């Protein structure tokens, strides 16, 4: 299979590229390097079956590049991925995540790709669900409360429309809180990368609010396994990719601190306005249509993440 990964120099995208190459496929990565890094591509570049294209997904040449590459599958992971930026700069967010996404989807269709697999956001497209609905499944109403979540929902709607109009196949993977090696603790990072960087630097970690807010933390290798499976299974579907388990920020901190050999507790700061209190995604449907399930425990994932940060 020949595949294109947009956002291919990023945390998840580069890990996906490595997985696809390990499976024997040819891979081209497209990335503007705004947040991605060529350092993430060293292993891929050594395979002889990899090409890197430095390009923004909003660029008008995207369709021509995809026409030249002629991929069977396009994995669209490039994004403006910071919810706070989307609130402060909604036009910029829509430019990248809606118009950029549509540019890729239309380019893939015109280039004859048999499928587009996109990274959606299970943490935002469902809005702020009632705790009694957790873990949420794919039948839950979608009422996103951030421009970022709105943009992700819009792309799902475009994919549905393109399948109806053109027969263009797709899978949309609604990701929980992804963590693991290569996540940037100084960029659009999740709390795991931030904690890892600070714990290893012997710096205090800040927890906002009382720390009892929950998230569904899913390890990056499990996530890219879902993407690889979605290239082959699941027609016109949206699947939640998470563990179904709520983990409090306090428990996450203690797990990571213990793994790092740090006895001290975190520093608590006032809660941030608008932050979701609880979140978890039901992955059962992904098990049915993709044959996927998460296999990495939080403890094992935290250890692997800390090891990577320690040795990079």
Locations of regions flagged by a protein language model:
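C-terminal substrate-binding subdomain of Rossmann-fold SDR/epimerase-dehydratase oxidoreductases
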Residues: 16, 56, 181, 197-312
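A glycine/serine/threonine-rich, flexible loop-to-helix segment
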Residues: 131-134, 185-193
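Hydrophobic aliphatic residues
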Residues: 45, 78, 108, 187, ...
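Hydrophobic alpha-helix immediately C-terminal to the catalytic Tyr-X-X-X-Lys motif of short-chain
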Residues: 154, 158-162, 195, 252, ...
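N-terminal Rossmann-like NAD(P)+-binding domain of SDR-like oxidoreductases, especially those catalyzing
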Residues: 1-178, 304
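Residue-level signal for the nucleotide or nucleotide-sugar donor/cofactor binding architecture
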Residues: 36, 88, 96-99, 139, ...
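Short alpha-helix within the catalytic core of nucleotide-sugar-dependent glycosyltransferases
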Residues: 34, 39, 192-193, 224, ...
């Amino acid at each position: 299979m020949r595949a294109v990964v947009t956002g291919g120099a990023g945390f998840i995208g580069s890990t996906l590229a490595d997985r696809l190459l390990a499976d024997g496929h040819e891979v081209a990565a497209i990335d503007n390097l705004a947040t991605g890094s060529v350092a993430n591509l060293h292993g891929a570049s050594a395979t002889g079956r990899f090409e890197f294209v430095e390009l923004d997904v909003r660029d008008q040449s995207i369709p021509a590049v995809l026409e030249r590459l002629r991929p069977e599958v396009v994995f669209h992971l490039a994004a403006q991925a910071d919810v706070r930026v989307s609130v402060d700069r909604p036009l910029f967010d829509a430019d990248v995540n809606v118009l950029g996404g549509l540019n890729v989807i239309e380019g893939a269709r015109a280039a004859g790709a048999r499928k587009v697999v996109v990274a959606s956001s299970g943490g935002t497209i469902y809005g702020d669900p009632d705790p009694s609905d957790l873990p949420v499944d794919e039948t839950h109403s979608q009422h996103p409360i951030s421009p970022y979540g709105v943009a992700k929902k819009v792309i799902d709607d475009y994919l549905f429309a393109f399948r109806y109009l053109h027969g263009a196949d797709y899978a949309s993977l609604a990701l929980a809180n992804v963590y693991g090696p290569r996540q940037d603790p100084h960029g659009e990072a999740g709390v795991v990368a931030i904690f890892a960087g600070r714990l290893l630097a012997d710096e205090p970690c800040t927890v906002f609010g009382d720390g009892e807010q929950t998230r569904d933390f899913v390890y990056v290798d499990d996530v890219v396994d879902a993407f690889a499976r979605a290239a082959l299974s699941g027609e016109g579907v949206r699947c939640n990719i998470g563990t179904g388990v709520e983990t409090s920020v306090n428990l996450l901190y203690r797990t990571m601190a213990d793994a790092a050999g740090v006895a001290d507790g975190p520093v608590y700061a006032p809660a941030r306005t608008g932050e979701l209190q609880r979140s978890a995604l039901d992955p059962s449907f992904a098990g049915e249509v993709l044959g996927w399930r998460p296999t990495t425990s939080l403890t094992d994932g935290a250890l692997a993440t800390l090891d990577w940060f320690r040795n990079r």
